[in-house]
Swiss-Prot record:
Reactions catalysed: adenosine(37) in tRNA + dimethylallyl diphosphate = N(6)-dimethylallyladenosine(37) in tRNA + diphosphate
Ligase as UniProt keyword: no
Binding of substrate, residues: T15, A16, S17, G18, K19, T20
Functional description taken from the UniProt entry: Catalyzes the transfer of a dimethylallyl group onto the adenine at position 37 in tRNAs that read codons beginning with uridine, leading to the formation of N6-(dimethylallyl)adenosine (i(6)A).
Spans annotated as Interaction with substrate tRNA: 38-41
InterPro entries, sorted: Dimethylallyltransferase, IPT, P-loop_NTPase
Protein name listed in UniProt: tRNA dimethylallyltransferase
A GO molecular-function annotation: tRNA dimethylallyltransferase activity
Family: Belongs to the IPP transferase family.
Organism, as annotated: Prochlorococcus marinus (strain NATL2A)
Length: 299
C-alpha cells in the first residue's frame, strides 16, 4: 500500500486499553511500521513496568523509538520530538504511511498536533536546588508559577514538575503557554481505544507485571543506576522500590500501583477528550473499524 500523500495513523488511548496488540494487528494489515509514543518505553532496561512490547511482538512488526536512551539520562519533550520526527519522516519517505501508538498525550500532541515545545537547555544549578525541595512543596511552587501545568502533572512526577519550573525560571513564561503551535506536515488520522472494562484490565495487567518480575526489574535498576533514579518514582517502579526498601508489603504495593494506574488512565482520558478529535473504536470490533477508517481516509 503506497498512498499518494504521507499518512500518519495515531492510535491513542489510556494505559492498559490494548493499544499494543491492536497496533500490531493494524500494522500487519496495512504493511506499516510502528513508532512508540510512550514516555517510559523509550528507556533501556525498563520493560515490565512500562508494558513494553515483548521481543516476540517486536519481531512481528518493526518498532521504532523503543530503548533509545538510558534511564540515567532522561530526555525532555523537545529532545523526543526532534528524535521522533526524524524517525517518522524517514519511515514516511519509504512507505508513505506509519503508525504511532501511545498513551502519552503531550508526546502525541508534540508530533501530530503541531506543538512546538520550548528548547530550554537543562539548568543544572536550578535543578539541583529544586531537587532539595520536598516534592509536595515543589508541586505547590508549580501551582503558583503555572496552575495549568500543575493541574496536568501528577505531584509524584518530579521530572516533569522540575522541567516546567525550569522553563518558567529560564524564560519567564509558563510551560503551558510557552508552546507555539505550528502545522504538522503530514495527514493525520486519530483513532482512539477506550474499553468499558478498563479498570479490570488495569487490575489484571498490574498483577501480571508483578508476577513477571516487576520487583526484580526494579532491583536491577537500583543496582545499575542507583536508588535515587528519578524514573523509579513513576508508577509501578515507585511501589516496587518501596517494597524492596521494606516500607510496604507485596499486597500494598499491588494495591497502590493499581490505584495510581487508574488515576493515570482517568487523566489520559480527559486529555484525549479535550485535546484530540479521535474516532473512538468499539472494543469488540476495533480492528475492522480501524481498517475501515484508514482505507476511507486513504480514498
Amino acid at each position: 500500500m503506497q498512498p499518494n500523500k504521507p499518512l500518519v495513523v495515531a492510535l491513542m488511548g489510556p494505559t492498559a486499553s490494548g493499544k499494543t496488540e491492536l497496533a500490531i494487528d493494524i500494522a500487519k494489515k496495512i504493511n506499516s511500521n510502528i513508532h512508540n509514543i510512550d514516555s517510559r518505553q523509550i528507556y533501556i532496561d525498563m520493560d515490565i513496568g512500562t508494558a513494553k512490547p515483548t521481543a516476540v511482538q517486536q519481531s512481528q512488526v518493526n518498532h521504532f523509538l523503543i530503548d533509545i536512551c538510558l534511564p540515567s539520562k532522561p530526555i525532555n519533550l523537545h529532545d523526543f520530538q526532534s528524535i521522533a520526527k526524524t524517525s517518522i519522516e524517514r519511515d514516511l519517505e519509504k512507505k508513505g504511511l506509519t503508525l504511532l501508538v501511545g498513551g502519552s498525550g503531550l508526546y502525541l500532541q508534540a508530533l501530530i498536533g503541531g506543538l512546538n515545545p520550548p528548547a530550554v537547555p537543562p539548568q543544572k544549578f536550578l535543578r539541583d536546588q529544586l531537587k532539595k525541595i520536598d516534592k509536595a512543596e515543589r508541586h505547590k511552587l508549580l501551582k503558583l508559577c503555572d496552575p495549568f501545568s500543575a493541574q496536568r502533572i501528577h505531584p509524584e512526577d518530579s521530572i516533569r514538575i522540575i522541567r516546567a519550573l525550569e522553563v518558567f525560571y529560564a524564560t519567564g513564561r509558563m510551560f503551558s503557554k510557552a508552546k507555539n503551535m505550528r502545522p504538522t506536515p503530514w495527514r493525520v488520522l486519530e483513532l482512539g481505544l477506550n474499553p468499558e472494562n478498563l479498570t479490570s484490565r488495569i487490575q489484571l495487567r498490574t498483577r501480571e507485571m508483578y508476577k513477571k518480575g516487576l520487583v526484580e526489574e526494579t532491583g536491577d535498576l537500583i543496582n545499575k543506576y542507583g536508588n535515587n533514579l528519578q524514573l523509579l518514582k513513576t508508577i509501578g517502579y515507585g511501589e516496587a522500590r518501596s517494597m524492596i526498601n521494606g516500607k510496604i508489603n507485596y499486597e500494598e504495593a499491588l494495591e497502590i500501583t493499581i490505584k495510581r494506574t487508574c488515576q493515570l488512565a482517568k487523566r489520559q482520558k480527559t486529555w484525549f477528550r479535550n485535546k484530540h478529535n479521535s474516532k473512538w473504536l468499539n472494543d469488540e470490533n476495533a480492528l475492522p473499524e480501524a481498517l475501515a477508517s484508514i482505507y476511507e481516509f486513504l480514498g
